[in-house]
Amino acid sequence: MSNDILLQLDKILDARKTESPETSYVASLYEKGLDKILKKVGEEATETVMAAKDAEYTQNNDNLVYEVADLWFHTLILLSHQGLSSTDITNELQKRFGLSGHEEKANRSKNDA
């Protein structure tokens, strides 16, 4: 997925904040608030885990890709609701690029102390 599609989604999700919850699924989630959005992210995460297990057994990743797309989409809704965007995440990933996972975790632990 190119970053362009993420930026396009950011704009659309931001625009949905002013749309009617009766006509926009995303607007309805915003209206219901953080707990509803978190519930959807949790549901999508669970469905992603189940799809990954199924994919390992069936050797077919189609449903896994579908579920990860749902998870990403709902995570983008969460970010937008919190006043963040995909750019915040890609910037964080860029900061971590080139670090080993162990090094990144050690740096995180130092910052949390």
From Swiss-Prot:
The family database entries (SUPFAM superfamilies) matched by this protein are listed as: all-alpha NTP pyrophosphatases (SSF101386)
Molecular function terms, GO-annotated? ATP binding; phosphoribosyl-ATP diphosphatase activity
Q: Which GO terms describe its cellular component?
A: cytoplasm
Q: Which Gene3D superfamilies match?
A: MazG-like
Query: Does this UniProt record's set of keywords contain Repeat?
Result: no
Query: Which cellular compartments is it found in?
Result: Cytoplasm
The source's domain of life comes to Bacteria
* Major subcellular site: cytoplasm
Its EC number is 3.6.1.31
Q: Which reaction does it catalyse?
A: 1-(5-phospho-beta-D-ribosyl)-ATP + H2O = 1-(5-phospho-beta-D-ribosyl)-5'-AMP + diphosphate + H(+)
Q: Sorted alphabetically, which Pfam families does this protein's record hold?
A: PRA-PH
> Which pathway, metabolic or otherwise, does it act in?
Amino-acid biosynthesis; L-histidine biosynthesis; L-histidine from 5-phospho-alpha-D-ribose 1-diphosphate: step 2/9
InterPro entries, per the entry: HisE (IPR008179), PRib-ATP_PPHydrolase-like (IPR021130)
EC class (word) = hydrolase
> GO BP, one example?
L-histidine biosynthetic process
Keyword line: Amino-acid biosynthesis, ATP-binding, Cytoplasm, Histidine biosynthesis, Hydrolase, Nucleotide-binding
Which PANTHER family does this chain map to?
HISTIDINE BIOSYNTHESIS BIFUNCTIONAL PROTEIN, HISTIDINE BIOSYNTHESIS BIFUNCTIONAL PROTEIN HISIE
- In which family does this protein belong, per the annotation? Belongs to the PRA-PH family.
Q: What is this protein called?
A: Phosphoribosyl-ATP pyrophosphatase
Organism name: Hydrogenovibrio crunogenus (strain DSM 25203 / XCL-2) (Thiomicrospira crunogena)
